[in-house]
Amino acid sequence: MFNVRVNVTLACTECGDRNYITTKNKRNNPERIEMKKYCPRLNKYTLHRETK
């Protein structure tokens, strides 16, 4: 059975730190994901985007 879920890294758009690792289903979400998450370096919530 082929596993569709893959691990992705989320990077802060303001400072560039890669703060989070999560999984996504490539079949349901083929585009890159974006989430508002907490950035410990900036001490605030910022937009985090999926990186390669």
UniProtKB/Swiss-Prot annotation:
SUPFAM superfamilies, sorted: Zn-binding ribosomal proteins
Family the entry assigns = Belongs to the bacterial ribosomal protein bL33 family.
Keywords for this entry?
Ribonucleoprotein, Ribosomal protein
Q: Which InterPro entries match?
A: Ribosomal_bL33 (IPR001705), Ribosomal_bL33_CS (IPR018264), Ribosomal_bL33_sf (IPR038584), Ribosomal_zn-bd (IPR011332)
Q: Which Pfam families match?
A: Ribosomal_L33
Coiled-coil residues are none
* GO MF term (any one): structural constituent of ribosome
The domain of life for this entry's organism is Bacteria
Q: In the UniProt record, which is one GO cellular component term?
A: cytoplasm
Q: Which species does the entry assign this protein to?
A: Staphylococcus aureus (strain USA300 / TCH1516)
Q: What is this protein called?
A: Large ribosomal subunit protein bL33B
State any GO BP term from the record. Answer: translation
